[in-house]
């Protein structure tokens, strides 16, 4: 294996979430979010504290603020969760709340985007073949937009079926392809000649990493793969998948959190 798995949490943050590769994240966001031209962004604290100590805090995969003060949350999820859409909405509430001062009569806030990169299909999009779907708050009958301050974007990579021979230079489709196939590649395909792909391949190449980073990447990918295999085995053996998946995902998130803090 020459390149690291972009859908691994640790690797995704390595390729998209560092100051040295910020241009990759900016290009990705400009491709995913329609009618935007993000020039710069700032990576922010990924942990959001709940106002109620009895309620859950939130830890994002990626959180950034753009040059126009928009807040963007990016989540990468490999295993299906029955309440994933609710989780996405829950994440958005932290970014709305944190922009409004307690006791203020002014409830204005900057736009919030939650981008979900998924290795599964959500039930809410069943029957829709589109890889990217975008949701806003709209009126039921007229579909009039209530506000453009909340945007939920889902990228269901299972719906992307194109091979390298089908790519035509579209940057977003090229990113979909890389997210699904990076570990299978021996070199950067010629069709992926945009500067953003050169950076993505350079950062994700294992031999380009320092020894500590490479060790962390390999350990993280191996642990994630082993846990997925355990869950698949449990399913085959007739063990309740939900219980096994919950335990395994909890272990993955815990390991990712520890490694991200190293």
Predicted regions and their residues:
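Accessory alpha/beta interaction modules
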Residues: 1-153, 159-163
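Short runs of predominantly hydrophobic/aromatic residues within well-ordered alpha helices
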Residues: 8, 25, 111, 151, ...
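Charged, alpha-helix-enriched surfaces in structured cytosolic catalytic cores
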Residues: 20-24, 79, 83, 170, ...
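Short amphipathic C-terminal alpha-helix that caps PH/PH-like domains
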Residues: 29, 92, 171-179, 204
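Short secondary-structure boundary micro-motifs
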Residues: 36, 45-49, 137-138, 172-174, ...
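Short, charged alpha-helical interaction segments and adjacent helix-coil junctions
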Residues: 72-77, 177-262
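Short intrinsically disordered coil segments
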Residues: 129-136, 168-175, 219-221
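Upstream accessory/linker segments immediately N-terminal to the RecA-like ATPase cores of bacterial MutS
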Residues: 148-193
